[in-house]
Regions:
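Bacterial N-terminal signal peptides
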Residues: 8-19
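Aromatic- and Gly/Pro-enriched helix-to-coil junctions and flexible linker segments
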Residues: 23-150
Length: 150
């Protein structure tokens, strides 16, 4: 009987809280943005093949021997086909938390003084969050789409 009384009291308290603040019960956290494949394919993915002074291309290391694996170019190719792009997109989804600017894709290759972390054996490719390539990655993580909307 005592247990029943405790449960009834708890139920009454919950009901009272919902009555006092009904909007709080209906609110849920905002949904995280989704990652757009077309934006990835046309804006993000080319960054992985770009040459930067003093650094190897991302694809040089990330096709083998690292936890984050990109697809190699087809023999003689200089870019990825749709199937390879889809596989790269899926690999990148493992290092991106949509909507989170602390995603590994953003902080590992970013200089520590610019907000990056100490990880990334391939060096710090961007010294500032204002770098145009870093801004493209950020836009994608925040839900930018090829059509330009979020």
């Amino acid at each position: 009987m005592k247990r029943h009384a405790i449960l009834a009291t708890i139920g009454s308290l919950v009901l009272a809280a919902l009555t006092i603040h009904p909007a709080a019960a209906a609110q849920s956290p905002p949904a995280a943005p989704s990652l757009d494949f077309e934006y990835f394919k046309t804006r993000v993915q080319p960054i992985f093949a770009a040459k930067r002074p003093g650094h190897a291309r991302c694809i040089s290391c990330h096709i083998a021997g690292t936890p984050l694996r990109l697809q190699p170019f087809s023999s003689g190719g200089t870019t990825w086909n749709d199937d390879e792009s889809r596989k790269n997109f899926e690999a990148m989804r493992r290092v991106v938390a949509p909507g989170n600017l602390k995603s590994r894709l953003l902080v590992h290759p970013l200089a520590e003084q610019a907000g990056g972390d100490f990880y990334h054996n391939g060096g710090k490719h961007w010294s500032s969050q204002n770098d145009p390539e870093w801004q493209i990655l950020k836009a994608w993580v925040l839900g930018e789409t090829k059509s330009g909307s979020e």
